[in-house]
Amino acid sequence: TYNLRLEYVQNKTEYALMRLLWQEPGKNLKEDAIQLAQNSDLVILCMGLSPLLEGEEMKVKVKGFAKGDREDIQLPETQTELIKAIHKLGKPTVLVLLNGSALAFNWEAENIPAIIEAWYPGQAGGTAVADVLFGDYNPAGRLPITFYKSMQQLPDYEDYSMKGRTYRFMTETPLYPFGYGLSYTRFSYGKATLNQSK
């Protein structure tokens, strides 16, 4: 828990705003996280992006992001370094992704046994993720977009042919295709029938 002290003075503004935002972790934060992981039975890593990184015309100084434009689709490098360092500890690890767009996380997909895509889950997101992790809720979602392995799988922005665009025209194997999703339950779809009464 953290104690926060907020002071607000009404000036000539019409509104007030407070945000808690992601910032690039410093060296001490990484060491602290590794120390916490060493003393834990299980590690739940919440990684990804924020609207500050993905938003338009944002002033951020993070490698791979330029004023809201993504120069790469990988997780931020500092996050990947932390994930790899914690993975070396040999602790059971769950990766919870928080983002609003597709990410490339090839190493994590191969090495982290449990990954949950939470998107931007809102104020009750922690409870929702906990319900999934503890088995109180059975996840059954499917990806509404394709997750590519790298920028090289994306079609050229200036090429307006359909080759490689969306899951329908992609010939390579993506990291996770449109519609991908796992569940604690096995689902099967049979031959659908329609009883037309009119």
Language model features with spans:
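C-terminal non-catalytic regions of proteins with extracellular/luminal or membrane-system context
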Residues: 1-198
